[in-house]
Amino acid sequence: MSERTFNWKNKDIRAQVDVVDSKLLPTLLLRNALVLNPYVKQWLKKNIWIYQDRIVYVGHELPNRAEEIHTIDCEGKYIVPGYIEPHAHPFQIYNPQTLAEYVSQYGTTTFVNDNLFLLLQSGKKKALTILNELKKQPVQYFWWSRYDLQTEVLNEDHVLPFDVRKQWIEHPDVIQGGEMTGWPRLVDGDDLMLHCMQATKKQRKRIEGHFPGASDKTLTKMKLFGADCDHEAMTGDEVMRRLELGYYVSLRNSSIRPDVRKILQELHEKGFRYYDHFFYTTDGATPNFYKGGMTNELIRIALEEGVPAIDAYNMASFNIAKYYQMDDYLGVVGPGRLASLNILEDPLNPNPVTVLSKGTILRENGCDLKAFTKTDWHKGGLVPLELSYDMTMDDLQFSMPMGVKMRNAVIMEPYMIEIDNSMEQLSFDHDESYLTMLDRHGKWRVNTMIKGFASSVQGFVSSFTTTGDIVAIGKNKADMLLAFARMKEIGGGIVLAENGNILHEIPLALCGCASSEAYEDVLEKEQKLRDLLTERGYEFCDPIYTLLFLQSTHLPYIRITPRGIFDVMKKTVLFPSIMR
């Protein structure tokens, strides 16, 4: 990479060397641990000297005056590098701080994050302010730079002009480009996207793909364009196809694609047991998926499926750091590396008893030390949503002949509307509901029907969508208006109304798309929302992703976008949005 922000200054390095020479005392000593060494693939009994945020010595010696140093006795315990999530979407109604604060207790302390939310919600100048704010936290955040907005908007050149893309690509905290949700545009001749990819490569940074179901020929083309890794393999065969073409592969286990166990079983059935080009990712799962942690759960699955322990842990740390050319800084418990590591009671149990990140103890002997601080989101323009308009009955006029039918939680296909949808209350005898999408600025709307969402949801409104525009779904127009009014009143969020009452709400104070509340509170509210929707006929796995992907044109077949109802396969607007 062209520039790195985590280099220590000369005086810091001199002080670290002085610690090795016993001229200064370490700030933390870990004694008698069995340390995972990924270079020799062995557990080695060592003492670890840490000075502030850096590991300065790993070996058999103890420092002078060791009794004066804060010491953790690791006799009989194992030390592994802090876990890395290489593909995070950190605003899935939670936010990067609260997510990290929660999952770091389970050992994940480095996050490579999507910047799409910041591009759409924070503005060109303020978005990078958030990166600096998050550096104050005791975990490590890196980012990727989007080449497209993952939906059809009216002004993409304004939201994502080349100068903004270039600014992100060249930022030292940005370590990759992608993910390539807009790759069909690239194949069709989008030279601006190719130019951005070339700019990424000139910075010696990686490019993340997004190639679900891609053929060998498509994968080959993407390699020629510059893609390095893909997280969309869903079977053992798809993993092998990518490996054979020279890709690194992120094995995904997310709330909508929990594939890791199945993939490992299929690879092992083929006799394939070579893991050096594999990572894990949870690909931005929704809150309840992380109830028991993040990367630790994927390591557990790998261990249960017979992956050797050292390989299972390398896939969570060393392999990722090496891929991003950061193994001199992360992913190794060794001299010169950042002091981010996990202390385990047993290598077969990836839940750490003690967690260090950037030299700070986040968890000790099973206790959360509350090391995080509040992030000032206002500096980055992430404030409560202020709508300048109200939804009215005029916004709930439905005459379109075609609606969207849910095949699963995220795949939508067209269907012809046959019921009478001119009334204010629809019957509970079918699973068709009104669907309206409103511009957050009040300029346009899209009205259609959605089939398969639920049979008895009366009024459901969310400002959590890909673009932050407002979606309203329901059987009863009055309850839809009530839910909208409450969503507006609380500054954005997800609201469920029924029979003139508010049943449930999730306030989303960060532009109406992410919560500022503690992760545990968000998790509890999301679970209650799932339960209420399930009771009313929602049959799929993840309503949060249903809301997010209604607009997302990287998935087939039909999407509700700011431009109107969009045919993804034909790349055309079937029914344009209507000016209000």
Curated annotation (Swiss-Prot):
GO BP, sorted A to Z: adenine catabolic process
A Pfam family that the UniProt record links to this protein: Amidohydro_1
MF terms in GO: adenine deaminase activity
InterPro entries in alphabetical order: Adenine_deam, Adenine_deam_C, Amidohydro-rel, Metal-dep_hydrolase_composite, Metal_Hydrolase
Cysteines paired by S-S bonds: none
Species this chain originates from: Bacillus subtilis (strain 168)
PANTHER family xrefs: ADENINE DEAMINASE YERA-RELATED, N-ACETYLGLUCOSAMINE-6-PHOSPHATE DEACETYLASE
Gene this protein is translated from: yerA
Swiss-Prot/TrEMBL keywords: Hydrolase, Phosphoprotein
Keyword Phosphoprotein attached: yes
CDD domains referenced in this protein's UniProt entry, alphabetically: AdeC
Modified residues (Phosphoserine): S399
Homology family: Belongs to the metallo-dependent hydrolases superfamily. Adenine deaminase family.
The protein's name in its UniProt record: Putative adenine deaminase YerA
Reactions this protein catalyses: adenine + H2O + H(+) = hypoxanthine + NH4(+)
